[in-house]
């Protein structure tokens, strides 16, 4: 076996080799510093040195590591697009300028890089000087991108050792974003194929995969591809950390696993998986030693909190200053005031009711009620629905002095989705609610993004039941009534609803194929604009939790099952019929 390894790895060093891998993922447009909770860094917070992150601090960490004499690699695992006023106003060109300034050794494409279609990716691919890699991304059927096909990998050299950096992007991009005719193939298959080619044809000794598919998929890559010794991942915003904590947290963040996750394989082979949370708050930092066979023998390191102890690089500040006036025209306008924290934390909004989700959905329902409605109806639709993954940030009333700005709202809703009207039956609506909780698992690495946020609906779930049979009870607002009230959802009855365009078009794997396109009406009303107007008209904001979503505990679930009786049997029959 050792002889075969030497034949596979020509030019292998006679001694162990050590390199420091710095990495980020899911920066989501946070080019300048933010608060520890991810909200905008106000002037007061900046003066008090309470803010973290930003590309200028990233650059300082990379420069300091290189100056120490270490063999440094700096990688990014995708999703620079979306999530901030900077991207909202400036788009892809600011991303290209930022990555050129940071000078990653390689970066992968995330699913959000495709949010503005094929055309939205062109500026990054044409203006970036950073190698963008993707072995499972096929542009051949997409005319706009065909000439810009990324290479599957790039080879860099450190201390005479050749290192292969192979990129990949989640196959789910097809329904998570708007990639047009771009195809995404199996990550592990293409990584193994490229790894074997790199060793055979280019004499590469160390193989690192960098990409955007999430921790569960990254673990699978480690298990299926023995050539890979390190996977630098993204997509799931997972905070891996093994250092000291205060009350189980680091800067307010609860670690979701060790850093790195170690996958032990046969014959003393192991593979490491790392991820760096999201929004550029930390810099992933791992030092790895490989032996003569290109296998990991030891490692050390932790994500570095990019706080005030790390100075901001002047060139990074100067880069942002060139665009600050353009951004500021939209950035600072005050929309409303809030008396409460508007909680958009993904570990709450994707797992349970959250008050920011309630506010957004109430704004949508109010907008629809303001439009002309059928005779005898007080509103145009009975309910509105969206996916919890569309809530991208909180609004912290303490750090902002209670003022909500245009920037704050764009940080929450950066995607520019619209509301789409349609008629659905109660059974079809229940099917959408079931899809929202079919992967619900509070213990998982990945809080699923598809939990249904709603206004005009009150839903009770029992997660102990089998997927697609978890809706215990649902009530919906009456529309042909002078005093709005919640009534039991009737599965055979037709209802008029509005849904966010993202899920209507298949986002988060929602299926609206039961509605013909000609029977859908896209209102054209954009989510962030609706919410800003609603906030302005209802200021000061005091949105609370109101019980519109309930997850039963085990004893409650038993009682609920006893009380459902014949309506429950009807529900079962309709669900079976719907899924045939």
Curated annotation (Swiss-Prot):
Keyword presence, Signal: yes
Tissue: Gut, ovaries and salivary glands.
Binding positions (Zn(2+) 2): 79, 111, 212, 235
Positions marked as site (Transition state stabilizer): 112, 115
Compartment(s): Cell membrane
Glycan attachment points: 172, 285, 423, 536
Disulfide bonds listed in the record: 41-51, 349-354, 478-481
UniProt GO BP: AMP catabolic process
Membrane topology reported for the UniProt record: Lipid-anchor; GPI-anchor
Organism expressing this protein natively: Rhipicephalus microplus
Protein family per UniProt: Belongs to the 5'-nucleotidase family.
Free-text description of this protein's post-translational modifications in UniProt: Glycosylated.
Entry's Gene Ontology molecular function annotations: 5'-nucleotidase activity; metal ion binding; nucleotide binding; UDP-sugar diphosphatase activity
Reactions mediated catalytically: UDP-sugar + H2O = UMP + alpha-D-aldose 1-phosphate; a ribonucleoside 5'-phosphate + H2O = a ribonucleoside + phosphate
Cited SUPFAM superfamilies: 5'-nucleotidase (syn. UDP-sugar hydrolase), C-terminal domain, Metallo-dependent phosphatases
Enzyme class: hydrolase
Broad class of where this protein is predominantly found: membrane
Record-given protein name: Protein 5NUC
Signal peptide stretch: 1-14
């Amino acid at each position: 076996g050792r002889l075969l390894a030497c034949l596979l790895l020509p030019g292998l060093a006679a001694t162990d080799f050590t390199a420091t891998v710095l990495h980020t993922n899911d920066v989501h447009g946070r080019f300048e510093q933010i608060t520890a909770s991810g909200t905008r860094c106000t002037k007061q917070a900046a003066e008090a040195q309470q803010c973290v992150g930003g590309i200028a601090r990233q650059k300082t960490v990379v420069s300091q590591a290189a100056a120490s004499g270490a063999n440094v690699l700096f990688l990014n695992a995708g999703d620079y697009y979306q999530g901030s006023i900077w991207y909202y106003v400036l788009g892809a060109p600011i991303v290209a300028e930022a990555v050129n300034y940071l000078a990653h050794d390689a970066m992968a494409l995330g699913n959000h890089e495709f949010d503005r279609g094929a055309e939205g990716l062109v500026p990054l691919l044409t203006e970036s000087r950073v190698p963008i890699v993707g072995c499972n991304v096929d542009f051949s059927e997409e005319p706009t991108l065909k000439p810009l096909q990324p290479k599957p990998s790039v080879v860099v050299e450190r201390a005479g050792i050749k290192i292969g950096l192979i990129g990949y992007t989640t196959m789910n991009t097809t329904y998570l974003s708007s990639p047009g005719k771009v195809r995404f193939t199996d990550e592990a298959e293409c990584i193994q194929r490229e790894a074997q080619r790199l060793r055979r044809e280019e004499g590469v000794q160390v193989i690192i995969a960098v990409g955007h598919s999430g921790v569960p998929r990254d673990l699978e890559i480690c298990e299926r591809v023995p050539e890979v010794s390190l996977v630098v991942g993204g997509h799931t915003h997972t905070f891996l950390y093994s250092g000291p904590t205060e009350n189980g947290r680091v800067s307010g963040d609860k670690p979701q696993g060790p850093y790195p996750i170690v996958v032990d394989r046969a014959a003393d082979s192991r593979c490491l998986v790392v991820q760096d949370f999201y929004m550029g708050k930390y810099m992933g930092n791992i030092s790895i030693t490989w032996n003569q066979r290109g296998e990991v023998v030891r490692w050390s390191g932790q994500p570095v909190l990019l706080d005030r102890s790390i100075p901001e690089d002047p060139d990074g500040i100067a880069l942002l200053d060139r665009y600050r006036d353009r951004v500021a025209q939209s950035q600072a306008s005050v929309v409303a005031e809030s008396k409460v924290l508007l909680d958009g934390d993904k570990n709450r909004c994707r797992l349970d009711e959250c008050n920011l989700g309630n506010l957004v959905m109430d704004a949508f329902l109010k907008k629809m009620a303001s439009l002309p409605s059928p005779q005898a109806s007080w509103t145009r639709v009975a309910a509105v629905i969206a996916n919890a993954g569309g809530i991208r940030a909180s609004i912290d009333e303490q750090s902002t002095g209670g003022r909500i700005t245009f920037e704050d709202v764009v940080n929450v809703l950066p995607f520019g989705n619209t509301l789409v009207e349609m008629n659905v039956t109660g059974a079809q609506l229940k099917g959408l609610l079931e899809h929202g909780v079919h992967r619900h698992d509070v213990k998982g690495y990945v809080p699923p993004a598809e939990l249904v946020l709603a206004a005009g609906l009150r839903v009770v779930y029992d997660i102990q039941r089998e997927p697609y049979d978890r809706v215990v009870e649902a009530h919906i607002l009456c529309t042909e009534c002078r005093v709005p009230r919640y009534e039991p959802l009737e599965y055979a009855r037709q209802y008029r609803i509005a849904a966010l365009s993202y899920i209507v078009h298949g986002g988060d794997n929602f299926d609206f194929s039961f509605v013909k396109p000609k029977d859908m009406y896209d209102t054209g009303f954009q989510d962030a604009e609706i919410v800003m107007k609603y906030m302005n008209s209802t200021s000061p904001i005091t949105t609370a939790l109101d019980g519109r979503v309930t997850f039963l505990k085990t004893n409650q679930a038993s009682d609920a099952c006893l009380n459902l009786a014949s309506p429950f049997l009807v529900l079962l029959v309709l669900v079976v019929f719907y899924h045939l």
